[in-house]
Amino acid sequence: MNEIITNKAAVVGVGNTAFSKNSGVSELSLASEAVLNAINDAGLKPSDIDGMTTFTMDNNDEIEIARALGIGDLNFYSRIPHGGGAATGLLHQATMAIATGMAETVVCYRALNGRSGHRYSSGVSGNLLTADAIHWGWYMPYGLLTPASWVAMFTQRWMHLTGITKDALFEVAHATRDYAANNPASPFYGQTFDRAEYDAQKVIADQLQLYDCCQETEGASAVIL
């Protein structure tokens, strides 16, 4: 499989919106802005796009973005479940589509109002529309309401099996912050931290402290392959 897709696709455009605590606009507006910025960055037109891929968690249907921007018929579209690592899955799906001739130009996008919109632990009401919602009943009643609390359980098990210590968690958090500190568009631009500051932060869910967690941020990003 690696031989089939190697050197068959490349990132040709990147687009972002501003990142904030309150975007003041809809997630569709954010997604459309990021996709259009990526199209412009690539020197393309909306009509050049014939494939789209995003997260299953994204609230913006491909057809709505296509309508908003003037993108024509799509030869390929897909969605990758879950959060976090799904971003790499989008690139993989887009690369496979291009390598197999399913599409020529694919945009990968994600938009989120992560603070002013729906927030984790705010509860779920109404009828269950899909089986996906059933699993919440296994941990929500016990206080596991956020991604940090879920990942903390995996982290505890991982540390137990491997002997890994907090040193490794610090390195991950520190490397991630370094990326942000060197990005002028990041809320953490120019703000680094050392081990002492990391250790001084409150525990969110043992073994995870504040700096191990992401912010509730609003914005959108898109890349074009």
Where are these regions (language model features)?
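Short, well-structured beta-strand segments enriched in hydrophobic/aromatic residues
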Residues: 105-109
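Active-site histidine-anchored catalytic micro-motif
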Residues: 89
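Conserved "HGTGT" condensation-loop signature of ketosynthase/thiolase-family condensing enzymes
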Residues: 1-82, 95, 99-100, 110-217, ...
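Short helix-initiation/N-cap motifs at beta->coil->alpha
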Residues: 84-86
